[in-house]
Amino acid sequence: MDTQSKIILISGPTASGKSSFAVLIAKKINGEIINSDSMQIYKQLKILTARPNKKEQKNIKHHLYGIADVKINFSTGQWLKLTIKKIKEIRRRKKIPILVGGTGLYFQSLINGLVTIPNIPMKFRNKIRLMQKNNGQEAFYKNLLKIDPKSKNKFDPNDVQRTVRAFEIKSYTKISMYDWLGKTKSNFKDKEFLKLYINFDRESLIKRISQRTSKMVKIGAIQEVKKFNKLRLKKELSANKVIGIEELTKYLNSE
């Protein structure tokens, strides 16, 4: 397999071993690893996001891990800009860029490009979120299809985040999110990407997730959540979506 001109994309479910697999490949083909997980971006959440530790990063360069503060929303556009720069730098060093992640939108933006959708005022966005909450997801999704039929079959009808995003874009710009996405252009050719997907059967994956969760608690996940909660972040910040924060907070509050 000729990998010299490739950009390797590794994806898969939580606890499927993407990070360790990426290191294994990087050692064999002289690669460097770029983070493509939107939560491993945040520096204060090392344990809960399963960010590669110093031992795992030894001898292999890792990029874009723990670079953003949880007090900010780190956008897909910011990630894409930094990633394109890193890919070019890695290639100049005659090495292979290996991207590892669980964030589909990141990979999608790299492969297809990212269009600049006009900024939507937070007041307007909050209004749409409240509408979704009051209507319920099922009714809200049906309303989306009425104003934006192009959203049909594009994502899971139960995906609140994507439904709200599609609704606010169509409502504010009068243009479907999928028409905006049609205007994109990538910095790379499709043939440059080598896509690898790791998967396990359901039973094995559940076991791996359980083992990972136990390990996280042992190495300080509860303490990490305590520190995070002391920051008293605004609810709309992305870092609040890290899996484990809500669950461990309820545990700490004895709920």
Model-derived segments and spans:
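Phosphate/pyrophosphate-binding catalytic cores of soluble transferases and nucleic-acid-acting enzymes
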Residues: 1-255
